[in-house]
Swiss-Prot record:
Similarity-based family: Belongs to the DNA polymerase type-Y family.
Names of required cofactors: Mg(2+); Mn(2+)
Biased composition (Low complexity): 587-602, 651-662
Catalyzed reactions per annotation: DNA(n) + a 2'-deoxyribonucleoside 5'-triphosphate = DNA(n+1) + diphosphate
Name of this chain's protein: DNA polymerase eta
Temperature dependence: Optimum temperature is 22 degrees Celsius.
A Pfam family recorded for this sequence: IMS
EC supergroup of this enzyme: transferase
Name of the gene encoding the protein in the UniProt record: POLH
The keyword Nucleotidyltransferase appears for this protein: yes
Length: 672
């Protein structure tokens, strides 16, 4: 939903820099022989030659359009050179283009606040740079103006008959009677032209730009004169730009809102909105949206340049059109594994290079039912807390898909059964990681994010579970079907400052394009138990004991820890009888000392504190597996998997002293 923001009172200078057919330029730099030839970059897709994602200007002159497929492009322009996007994991690999885009951003960011909007476009706030230039070297004082500056297109610029275009631009820029707004724009024209020249020199890429007083107008202007040119929108020319602009061309009006304006109010251009009062628009679309519509009709936008060089999210997706649509859960899982692997690599790179970690994993998909024209309902998106590591992301992505599938098919009154999707087809899959935050300073090693460290999630003041939470999605049963609190990115000594909540899949926003705050909600669960570990050495053999104590704090932990967390980080070898007797003797002696003497407070208090925990050990062979049947299915699977692992690990490592310690008391008795 659009958000109405008041425009800054002071004049701003905002530029939108857009690379010219960027993918083609990247390939031309790699293969210089393609320069000057009609060429295009095609997606990885064998069907009809693949879809075009970038078309050179030479190919456009031959009638080739980006909406075409490779075979169509060759029919329209037989001499066209088609270059396929690099492939990895059976899908397009865009890392080459991302890296090239980063080269451009590193150059543009030197001029002021910079916001990377996509692989090939950037917003710049040049207000400070323009004000400095206006104070030190105003345009009217310049004797020489660069040729690139004089090529600028200035909307609303008056030209006398017979005047040279470049001379008219010079006169507009150097006006002494211009108001402050226009003088700042003149400085912006000079700054942007120099930046574009620098980008061309260092990267061999051309770019176009729009220069205006806000992001909205700059974005509209950047595409008006391509390639390798820049367009300026002075304040006086705003209405000229917007009066004839189709309503669907305006950002955020290309969907349902724009359609509603056309059908309900008869609005075809942005200028048509001027006939409606702010109150009238608010009556139709609410206070916030109504005010936003009233503002954009007048070229008003207070949206700030965010000063962000790094992406807000990472994603990986693939479409399966026509006969390539997925027909079984196994093929869906295969492709989710591929997408998750790519996403994991990008997250790991971001973590290593930028010290950032993502908080939320989201799955999007599209589906339809063959021979059913009424089946094109939106496939619900699902989100859960982010866990790092390829296997974990793959597992969570598939669980999210299954939850979404149950909800989607449930809307038709159908329950999914078996591996086959029957008449259903999946035509698109994507996984994304969002809500990315910086890692707090003082973190000893980022590799901790890839290590499983079982910690009990704590609860913040607002009741949210803190820490990365592993979970298995359920559509109909909500969070209670399967739950785990294995923390995958825990750093005990550092608070990451990120709060996560377990998702409730029954109350999720189904907007595929956004991960909203309501996508992830808190799930009630049982009180957690704090498990502490002690270790000591005896007769050259290191053993570990498990201490179990209740937390007396007023703030109780939430979340149901996996039962395997209690066992998996401890040595399964029980303490010897001698050790147990020695511990018991020390415990009793320390208690008696506490009651009989106060002269040794320091030593005795320490011993009493140690004796408050009841020590116990266990031996995996003594666990009665018949009691497993009384446990939830999820815990049964975890325990059996754990015991198999420990049995292999401990083979041949018995002490041979016959000492045993039972854990049977941990389980309720089995009624036979």
């Amino acid at each position: 939903m659009p958000v109405a923001r008041p425009e800054a009172s002071d004049a701003r200078v905002i530029a939108h820099v857009d690379m010219d057919c960027f993918y083609v330029q990247v390939e031309q730099r790699k293969q210089p022989e393609l320069r000057g030839l009609p060429s295009a970059v095609v997606q990885y897709n064998e069907w009809q030659g693949g879809g075009l994602i970038a078309v050179s200007y030479e190919a456009r002159k031959c009638g080739v359009k980006r909406s075409m497929r490779g075979d169509e492009a060759k029919a329209a322009c037989p001499q066209i050179q088609l270059v396929q996007v690099p492939v990895a994991r059976g899908k397009a690999d865009l890392n080459l283009y991302r890296s090239a885009g980063s080269e451009v951003v590193s150059i543009l960011a030197k001029s002021g606040k910079c916001e990377r909007a996509s692989i090939d476009e950037v917003y710049l706030d040049l207000t400070d740079a323009a004000e400095s230039m206006l104070a030190d070297a105003p345009p009217e004082s310049l004797e020489l103006i660069d040729e690139e500056v004089l090529k600028s297109h200035i909307l609303g610029m008056n030209r006398e008959d017979g005047d040279d275009f470049k001379e008219s631009v010079r006169n507009w820029i150097c006006r002494e009677d211009a108001d402050r707004r226009d003088k700042l724009l003149s400085c912006g024209i000079i700054i942007v032209a120099e930046l574009r020249k620098q980008v061309l020199k260092e990267t061999e890429f051309t770019c176009s730009a729009g220069i205006a007083h806000n992001k909205m107008l700059a974005k509209l202007a950047s595409g008006m004169n391509k390639p390798a040119q820049q367009t300026v929108v002075p304040y006086a020319a705003v209405q000229e730009l917007l009066s004839s602009l189709p309503i669907k061309k305006m950002k955020q009006l290309g969907g349902k809102l724009g359609t509603s304006l056309q059908t309900d109010l008869g609005v075809d251009t942005v200028g048509d909105l001027l006939q409606f009062s702010e109150t009238k628009l608010q009556e139709h679309y609410g206070v916030n949206t109504g005010t936003w519509l009233w503002n954009i009709a007048r070229g008003i936008s207070g949206e700030e340049v965010q000063g962000r060089l790094l992406p807000k999210s990472h994603g990986s997706g693939k479409t399966f059109p026509g006969p390539r649509a997925l027909k079984s859960l196994s093929t869906v899982q295969h492709w989710l594994n591929q997408l998750s692997e790519e996403l994991s690599e990008r997250l790991g790179s971001d973590l290593e290079q930028n010290k950032r970690i993502a908080s939320t994993l989201t799955l999007h998909a599209s589906a339809f039912r063959s021979k059913d024209s009424d089946s094109h309902k939106k496939f619900p998106s699902k989100s859960c807390p982010m866990r790092y590591g390829v296997t974990k992301i793959q597992e969570d992505a598939f669980n999210l898909f299954q939850a979404a599938l149950r909800e989607y098919m449930g809307s038709f009154g159908i329950k999914p059964q078996g591996n086959k999707l029957e008449t259903w087809r999946i035509t698109g899959l994507s996984v994304s990681a969002s809500k990315i935050v910086d890692i707090p300073s003082g973190t000893s090693s980022i590799m901790r994010y890839f290590q499983s460290q079982p910690t009990v999630p704590s609860r913040s003041a607002d009741g949210c579970v803190q820490g990365n939470v592993a979970m298995t999605a359920s559509a109909s049963e909500g969070c209670s079907e399967q739950r785990s609190t294995e923390t995958q990115a825990a750093m005990p000594e550092v608070d990451t400052g990120v709060t996560y909540t377990l998702p409730n899949f029954e109350n999720q926003d189904k907007d595929i394009d956004l991960v909203s705050e309501k996508d992830v909600v808190s799930c009630p669960s049982n009180e957690a138990t704090d498990v502490s570990t002690q270790s000591e050495s005896n007769k050259g053999t290191q053993t570990k004991k498990i201490g179990r104590k209740m937390n007396n704090s007023k703030e109780k932990n939430r979340g149901m820890p996996s039962i395997v967390d209690i066992f998996k980080n401890y040595n399964a070898t029980p303490p010897s009888k001698q050790e147990t007797q020695e511990d018991s003797t020390v415990s009793s002696a320390s208690k008696r000392a506490k009651l009989s003497s106060s002269s040794h407070n320091s030593q005795v208090n320490q011993e009493v504190e140690e004796s408050r925990e009841t020590d116990w050990g266990y031996k995996t062979d003594e666990i009665d597996q018949s009691v497993f049947d009384e446990l939830p299915v999820e815990i049964q699977r975890e325990l059996r998997s754990f015991l198999r692992t420990n049995k292999q690990f401990n083979t041949g490592k018995s002490k041979g002293d016959g000492s045993t310690s039972s854990i049977a008391h941990y389980f309720p008795p089995l009624n036979r």
